[in-house]
């Protein structure tokens, strides 16, 4: 009888607690990925805003060309190495799908998703909005982290105290870092990724996190669907 009491919450809560036919997380992940231009880099905050994206990519095959970066994981060397390797352009004769257990190089943009970047009357009626592209779709020519294993390990052991505010130039952007805190490894790698990728790939931040603010690049963001795109330069120029 005592153990049966434990079943009471299950029975009473099941009708509203079940996730059957609840597609909100899946749809949110799909829409966020489809807010990003081909071969984009997308910074997320943590598990809750990342796992729906990974599900969409790995289970449904949606926008596998997008590199999802979990900022809370960037403080670990294995994750930095993984990002470097999976964004490295594939050498001639090598396919990113040849190893079923891991991603070994940059996965290609799937042209079957091109309907997102054009607009027809049917799409407009269905609420689909085209994303304007400012350049032709082309594969990236370099990884997002161009550091060897030793350099990555050195970054992981570096915690910089910000005694005073500093500005860091990344591309045509001036990132403003406030005083009074620490510059953690993920901050350093995040700025490195932006600096190395801003002319090679579109860079985005999920609307669910504050990574752009912590990296000091928030004034350069433009809303695009469920993501914020980082503009390489002054928005008012």
Predicted features and spans:
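ER/secretory pathway lumenal C-terminal domains and tails of membrane proteins involved
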Residues: 1-41, 51-237
């Amino acid at each position: 009888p005592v153990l049966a009491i434990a079943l009471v919450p299950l029975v009473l809560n099941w009708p509203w607690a079940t996730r059957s036919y609840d597609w909100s997380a899946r749809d949110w992940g799909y829409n966020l990925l489809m807010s990003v231009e081909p071969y984009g880099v997308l910074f997320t905050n943590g598990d809750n805003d990342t796992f729906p994206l990974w599900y969409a990519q790995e289970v449904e095959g949606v926008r596998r060309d997008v590199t999802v970066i979990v900022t809370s994981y960037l403080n670990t060397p294995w994750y930095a190495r993984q990002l470097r390797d999976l964004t490295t352009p594939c050498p001639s004769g090598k396919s990113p799908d040849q190893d079923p257990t891991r991603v070994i190089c940059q996965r290609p943009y799937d042209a079957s998703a091109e309907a997102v970047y054009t607009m027809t009357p049917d799409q407009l009626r269905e609420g689909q909005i085209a994303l304007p592209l400012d350049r032709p779709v082309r594969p990236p020519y370099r990884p997002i982290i161009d550091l060897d294993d030793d350099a990555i390990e050195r970054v992981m052991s570096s915690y910089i105290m910000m005694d005073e505010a500093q500005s860091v130039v990344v591309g045509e952007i001036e990132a403003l870092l406030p005083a009074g805190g620490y510059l953690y490894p993920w901050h350093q790698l995040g700025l490195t990724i932006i600096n190395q990728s801003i002319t090679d790939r579109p860079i985005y931040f999920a609307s669910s996190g504050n990574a752009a603010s912590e990296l000091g690049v928030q004034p350069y963001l433009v809303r695009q669907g469920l993501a914020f795109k980082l503009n390489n330069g002054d928005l008012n120029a």
